[in-house]
Amino acid sequence: YLYHNKVVLKYPGTEGFRYHQDYFYWYDMGNIYPDMAAVQIALDACTRNNGCLKVLSGTHKLGRLNHTALAQSSDSGVDEERLKEIMKRFPVVEIELAVGDAVLFHANLLHGSADNHSAEPRVTLLGCYNTKHNSPYRGSASGHPYYSSQKPMSAEIVETDLMRLPDYSLMY
């Protein structure tokens, strides 16, 4: 089920994200298992120049790693000494995406991004998925949902149903 989603807007000159695991945060939100994944969908081209996603291939097999807070920031990531050792053993893969491309990755995969050195913003959609057996065991202030079963739709969607939907087109 959809656990969390957001639009990621990376303005020109924006700093990248330190290597981290999503499950490090989701574990603290009451998810016992790392049976979670994220999908990033490119609304703009994601290139090395504008700070595309980069992953350390195979690091999802390391399990949940401790993270440390960055000085003068709300960001956190894997301890620098441990990260240096990990980077000797696992290759960095930069994930360049064309508009409409998507990449799916495990919640324990170490990932981050570089700075946006381009003159243009970069927009992606991020959807994070959980399994129903891993519904958080306790509430959290994050607003991420518990699993709830969905009832199948019994009526066919007709043209007038679509007319009532809001316009979600992006303009910038």
Where are these regions (language model features)?
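Conserved double-stranded beta-helix
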Residues: Y1-V55
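Feature marks short, surface-exposed loop/turn motifs that line or immediately flank catalytic pockets
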Residues: Y11, T47, L62, T131-H133
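Conserved hydrophobic/aromatic beta-strand scaffold that supports enzyme active sites
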Residues: R18, A38-A42, V92-E94, A102-L104, ...
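Active-site neighborhoods and metal-handling regions in enzymes and metal-associated proteins
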Residues: A42-A45, L62, Q150-K151
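Non-heme Fe(II)/2-oxoglutarate
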Residues: A102-L104, N108-Y172
